[in-house]
From Swiss-Prot:
Job of this protein: Catalyzes the conversion of uracil and 5-phospho-alpha-D-ribose 1-diphosphate (PRPP) to UMP and diphosphate.
Protein name: Uracil phosphoribosyltransferase
SUPFAM superfamilies: PRTase-like
Keyword Ligase on entry: no
UniProt lineage: Bacteria, Bacillati, Actinomycetota, Actinomycetes, Kitasatosporales
Amino acid sequence: MRIHVVDHPLVAHKLTTLRDKRTDSPTFRRLADELVTLLAYEATRDVRTELVDIETPVTPTTGVKLSHPRPLVVPILRAGLGMLDGMVRLLPTAEVGFLGMIRNEETLKAETYATRMPEDLSGRQVYVLDPMLATGGTLVAAIRELIERGADDVTAVVLLAAPEGVEVMERELAGTPVTVVTASVDERLNENGYIVPGLGDAGDRMYGTAE
């Protein structure tokens, strides 16, 4: 597993505004969308391409296009939905799947409650969207399901990560073809499982349900 923290002044600027508790939901959604597009630029650096012959108004030439099978973008419901537009803006021809995950309050493990994606992901590049990598449990469970379906190249795009979550990912997904792209690895998790300094509950702030 590999983690890539995107170092760019626009990423830092937008992330700072997202962190600010005074930022309202409409602004939060817009900035999250913009930030995802910046992260997606880095996340797709190794997207698979193939050569194609074309003809410009001047002369024939050779260019590149995205290879088949198409990349698959999978937001984790619900907060991952708020990242979808920012990702497919760069990959408009990508296929979109959905994965619903919820924590079992008895086992404290993430469980799947809804899926909408191909059964066979062999040879597919998959981009998973989830705003926060906190404890890592949800993202590990989601990526394992994708790998079980045959995905051989998975990139997780997250706005923020906690070192505890990164450690869990590195331990549980050691040796797997997984990359995490994020705007920041923050200091720690607090006793309530929130990333510090973080930005609060991304889903609540996106959808206007934060107190």
